Amino acid sequence: MAGQKIRIRLKAYDHEAIDASARKIVETVVRTGASVVGPVPLPTEKNVYCVVRSPHKYKDSREHFEMRTHKRLIDIIDPTPKTVDALMRIDLPASVDVNIQ
């Protein structure tokens, strides 16, 4: 697999969970002998939802809720078959979305 690259994108609402998952992936890759670039923090996506507090009137009274989506990018340079096997076996929290390219 010389000259190849694996790109892993992580997405989560909790920044502590995504950082712990990225740390676990980097440790696994380094232990199996491949080189790694990252984790690179990508821009945090912020969605704000405005909701009227009252069910009937008083439209001026509103409440704002926000959801932040944290993202990280990890590149694995020249992965070995042992690296790919270790990545398939790694156990990550369900709250972290992993996209491998």
Curated annotation (Swiss-Prot):
GO terms for biological process: translation. Gene3D superfamilies: Ribosomal protein S10 domain (3.30.70.600). The keyword ATP-binding does not apply. InterPro entries: Ribosomal_uS10, Ribosomal_uS10_CS, Ribosomal_uS10_dom, Ribosomal_uS10_dom_sf. GO terms for cellular component: ribonucleoprotein complex; ribosome. The keyword tRNA processing does not apply. GO terms for molecular function: structural constituent of ribosome; tRNA binding. Keywords: Ribonucleoprotein, Ribosomal protein. It comes from the Bacteria. This is Small ribosomal subunit protein uS10. Involved in the binding of tRNA to the ribosomes. The gene is rpsJ. Part of the 30S ribosomal subunit. It comes from Mycobacterium ulcerans (strain Agy99). Belongs to the universal ribosomal protein uS10 family. It holds the Pfam family Ribosomal_S10.
